[in-house]
């Protein structure tokens, strides 16, 4: 709750990692007004592994859903279905280094450069070019942190 209140006070987005506590997490987010729908600043559901319903509830509150290397695992069929169903405009990609290395590096120490495997997997899953995933998730990052002007200046350079 303090984390949410600090986010509201500073105008900085929340980074939320919930594991086996989705109902409690969403309830607290609602009670504390974490979402943009309640005057909060929104944020990101980091290293997301929950259901489509949880993802949709978070998106309705103005959150992005971030996928790590877990989405590339053969055993992650439910998570892959979530990723397929979500709009790319509300997705982020991450590595969660040094853990959860994506295929083909599973079981090894993860590193930031492996984020390309997450992007490639999501592109293949959605049937779109990897460049589209890279471009949209980069735009989403700059939007989340309210850095669109910086992104525009970089693009113009």
What are the roles of these predicted feature ranges?
Residues 1-61, 73-77, 81-82, 86, ...:
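Divalent metal-binding pocket/active-site signature
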């Amino acid at each position: 709750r303090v984390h949410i209140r600090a986010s509201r006070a500073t105008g900085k987005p929340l980074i939320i990692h919930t594991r086996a506590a989705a109902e409690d997490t969403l309830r607290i987010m609602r009670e504390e007004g974490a979402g943009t729908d309640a005057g909060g600043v929104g944020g990101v559901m980091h290293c997301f592994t929950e259901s489509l319903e949880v993802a949709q509830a978070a998106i309705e509150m103005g959150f992005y859903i971030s996928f790590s290397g877990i989405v590339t695992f053969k055993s992650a069929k439910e998570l892959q279905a979530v990723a397929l169903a979500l709009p790319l405009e509300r997705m982020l990609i991450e590595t969660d280094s040094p853990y959860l290395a994506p295929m083909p590096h599973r079981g090894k120490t993860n590193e930031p450069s492996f984020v390309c495997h997450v992007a490639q997997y999501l592109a293949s899953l959605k049937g779109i070019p990897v460049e589209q995933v890279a471009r949209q998730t980069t735009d989403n990052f700059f939007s989340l942190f309210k850095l669109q002007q910086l992104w525009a200046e970089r693009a113009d350079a």
